[in-house]
Amino acid sequence: MCTGKCARCVGLSLITLCLVCIVANALLLVPNGETSWTNTNHLSLQVWLMGGFIGGGLMVLCPGIAAVRAGGKGCCGAGCCGNRCRMLRSVFSSAFGVLGAIYCLSVSGAGLRNGPRCLMNGEWGYHFEDTAGAYLLNRTLWDRCEAPPRVVPWNVTLFSLLVAASCLEIVLCGIQLVNATIGVFCGDCRKKQDTPH
């Protein structure tokens, strides 16, 4: 596969994953679709750190767009040198995207490990923090959270989605980093294939 076609494929995948991260993070702000918990201090710190919005979302959107542009044959920098410049930009953007995806992964992993902030026995707090993530396997503990209702499965589902998406983003940004580096030094094979004889 040519470096340009690979870049375009990776870029479109990254854009899709960053949209998944943004939506998942937005849903974490409204447990069970109820906005009444958002205005108070009843959401966990990991929700407010916006790992999915900032890290897996905006910081990965830049390399996604750069990869799509590097894979295209746009008017900006036509020819061999222009495509190599877009590939070079994609190298730096991909490194930036890896950092964003790592941020999303670390925040989401901490959110899974610590559990949600919830009301249990009349007290708000991180009641699953001391279990070191063991609450994930014991669903009977999930019902002990009185408010927000069903917050544990909500957080587990969305943080797990963010962990999976950010892992894929790290892999795809790494692939694009290598692909774009090859594209900078070797160029794009499509130029030779697409020219009429």
Curated annotation (Swiss-Prot):
Keywords attached to this entry: Cell cycle, Cell membrane, Glycoprotein, Lysosome, Membrane, Transmembrane, Transmembrane helix
Q: Organism's domain of life?
A: Eukaryota
Provide the glycosylation site positions.
Answer: 138, 155
Summarizing the annotation, the consequence of altering residue 124 to A is: Disrupts arginine-binding
Which is a Gene Ontology cellular component entry for this protein? plasma membrane
Q: In which tissues is it expressed?
A: Intestine. Overexpressed in pancreatic cancers.
Please list the residue ranges that the record places on the Extracellular side of the membrane. Answer: 31-46, 112-157
InterPro entries, sorted: L6_membrane (IPR008661)
Q: Which residues bind L-arginine?
A: 124-129
Q: Map out region (Interaction with MTOR and CASTOR1) in residue numbers.
A: 91-197
Q: Name one GO biological process term.
A: regulation of G1/S transition of mitotic cell cycle
* Lipid bilayer topology: Multi-pass membrane protein
The entry's stated outcome for residue 129 to A is:
Disrupts arginine-binding
TM region(s), chain numbering: 10-30, 47-67, 91-111, 158-178
Report the locations given in the UniProt record. Lysosome membrane; Cell membrane
Pfam families hit by this protein: L6_membrane
Which coarse location class describes where this protein primarily resides? membrane
Side Cytoplasmic, residues: 1-9, 68-90, 179-197
A single Gene Ontology MF term assigned here is: arginine binding
Q: What does the UniProt record say this protein does?
A: Acts as a lysosomal membrane arginine sensor. Forms a complex with MTOR and SLC38A9 on lysosomal membranes in an arginine-regulated manner, leading to arginine efflux which enables the activation of mTORC1 which subsequently leads to RPS6KB1 and EIF4EBP1 phosphorylations. Facilitates cell cycle G1/S phase progression and the translocation of the CDK4-CCND1 complex into the nucleus. CDKN1B and RHOA/ROCK signaling activity are involved in TM4SF5-mediated acceleration of G1/S phase progression.
Tell me the protein family, please: Belongs to the L6 tetraspanin family.
Q: How does it assemble?
A: Interacts with MTOR; the interaction is positively regulated by arginine and is negatively regulated by leucine. Interacts with SLC38A9. Interacts with SLC7A1; the interaction is negatively regulated by arginine. Interacts with CASTOR1; the interaction is positively regulated by leucine and is negatively regulated by arginine.
**Could you tell me what this protein is called?**
Transmembrane 4 L6 family member 5
This chain's source organism reads Homo sapiens (Human)
